[in-house]
């Protein structure tokens, strides 16, 4: 993103540009959340466009009382996803952008497993049949230990890491424990929304949104940003 901005500013006249600068976006789910709404928003935000967007959610912090239920609902939606040629309407998830992303996916899955993460869904690079004509992967949902380095690394892939919590202030500390502050999402009661908005460190926030946990703005029409 910075290289593009520098190139656009280097000519005789400045030229407008839209750049993707990165994000490591969290979503918090409390025990008071509408879990169907949360599951739909998380799936759309984490896996839409293959997770290859700066606003995609990649970190999920869910209250231990509802964690099993929410993760099961996410898994059920992932089971129903059709992967394939994105020009065909029946397919929801297309390929990742290139061979490098394909290789990165396999490496990140290996790193998750080596640290003892529990892969609840996905983890395979798809190469059989028509999948051999592109860079296809399965969407990943993984419960990972809090010390895993990938919690702070932007993967830019359809990978959602989840962690359970007991205390919401503890969850907020985890959510804010990153150098990036682009977007953040929340699912809980209406009474909890002000607490989320006042404490989360992100430029763009969404609360109880089924259409996308941390996504919504459309680049070029609705510029957005956030930093620390």
Where are each of the predicted segments found?
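ALDH superfamily catalytic-core signature
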Residues: 1-146, 168-169, 173-174, 207
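Conserved C-terminal structural/oligomerization subdomain of aldehyde/semialdehyde dehydrogenase
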Residues: 28, 82, 132-228
């Amino acid at each position: 993103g910075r290289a593009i901005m520098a190139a656009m500013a280097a000519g005789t006249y400045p030229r407008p540009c839209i750049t993707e600068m990165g994000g490591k976006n969290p979503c918090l789910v409390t025990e008071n959340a509408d879990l169907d709404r949360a599951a739909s928003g998380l799936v759309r935000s984490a896996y839409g466009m293959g997770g290859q967007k700066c606003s995609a959610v990649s970190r999920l912090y869910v209250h231990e009382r509802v964690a099993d239920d929410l993760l099961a609902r996410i898994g059920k939606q992932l089971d129903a996803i059709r992967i394939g040629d994105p020009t065909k309407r029946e397919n929801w998830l297309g390929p990742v952008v290139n061979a490098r992303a394909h290789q990165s996916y396999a490496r990140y899955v290996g790193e998750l497993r080596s640290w003892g993460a529990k892969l609840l869904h996905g983890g395979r690079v798809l190469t059989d049949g028509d999948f051999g004509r592109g860079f296809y992967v399965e969407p990943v949902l993984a419960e990972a230990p809090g010390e895993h380095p990938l919690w702070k690394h932007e993967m830019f892939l359809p990978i959602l890491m989840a962690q359970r919590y007991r205390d919401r202030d503890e969850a907020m500390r985890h959510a804010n424990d990153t150098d990036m502050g682009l977007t953040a999402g929340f699912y809980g009661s209406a009474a909890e929304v002000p607490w989320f908005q006042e404490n989360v460190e992100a430029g763009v926030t969404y609360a109880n949104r089924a259409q996308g946990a941390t996504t919504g703005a459309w680049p070029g029409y609705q510029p957005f940003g956030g930093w620390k």
